[in-house]
Amino acid sequence: MGTSIVNLNQKIELPPIQVLFESLNRENETKPHFEERRLYQPNPSFVPRTNIAVGSPVNPVPVSSPVFFIGPSPQRSIQNHNAIMTQNIRQYPVIYNNNREVISTGERNYIITVGGPPVTSSQPEYEHISTPNFYQEQRLAQPHPVNESMMIGGYTNPQPISISRGKMLSGNISTNSVRGSNNGYSAKEKKHKAHGKRSNLPKATVSILNKWLHEHVNNPYPTVQEKRELLAKTGLTKLQISNWFINARRRKIFSGQNDANNFRRKFSSSTNLAKF
């Protein structure tokens, strides 16, 4: 009980009046410029407006769209700046600046917009290898000399075939072509003989066939036995003999008696020429 009385009688020191006036002046000072940022939200609502001074009343402000009055915060601005920089670096292609440091097109645009040092246009934005120098180095590295007339776009043309090789190829081609033509001619001749087409038969063979035809003028159609006899005498094939008689009948030399007489005269003249 005694201790409580001592505490009540203890002197309490109040702050000086000047300090109180200074605190009031701080409240009446001009407030810093607030940055207005609109955040797109689906449902607009009442957003309270806050002051920097501690203990000031909170007044809700009705707005049509959500608006935040945010005071300047250097730490937050630095974080936002870093986030924007990283986003731009991921989004835009990489280029090189004067100091050979990797920057992005978005970062370059951001520096120009904010007012930082712009990228100078004296140096090209994109680095590339010069084509003539690159191919010139390749040309110098070659062990054997190359003429300029053989270079097209830095590459060498294939060497043409030499004349001697061309002559050799042409000679082989000509020889093969001659052999092929001879083989083709012989095959064609064999084909003609196989099919019994008209060819120059020996005179002795023709005289034998004409003799049989003269003896059988009225019926120039040899039987199977007669054909066998003619095959044995002439040495021809059965197909050749049949074709020869077909052609002889197509000449219409057996149409009448006069034709038969003419045939006899021709046959006699041909036999006389064969004797001579």
Curated annotation (Swiss-Prot):
SUPFAM superfamilies the record matches: Homeodomain-like (SSF46689)
Record's compositionally biased regions (Polar residues): 176-185
Q: Which GO terms describe its biological process?
A: regulation of DNA-templated transcription
Ranges of Basic residues compositional bias?
Answer: 189-199
Q: Where is this region: Disordered?
A: 176-199
Which residues mediate DNA binding here?
194-256
GO cellular component, as recorded: chromatin; nucleus
Q: Does the keyword Coiled coil apply?
A: no
Q: List the disulfide bonds.
A: none
Question: Matching InterPro entries, A to Z?
Answer: HD (IPR001356), Homeodomain-like_sf (IPR009057), KN_HD (IPR008422), TALE_homeobox (IPR050224)
Task: Give the UniProt subcellular location, in the record's own words.
Answer: Nucleus
Tell me which UniProt keywords the record has, alphabetically. Answer: DNA-binding, Homeobox, Nucleus
Among Pfam families, the record links this protein to: Homeobox_KN
Its Gene Ontology molecular function terms? chromatin binding; DNA binding
Query: What protein family does this chain belong to?
Result: Belongs to the TALE/CUP9 homeobox family.
Q: Under which name does UniProt file this protein? A: Homeobox protein TOS8
From which organism does this entry originate? Saccharomyces cerevisiae (strain ATCC 204508 / S288c)
The encoding gene is TOS8
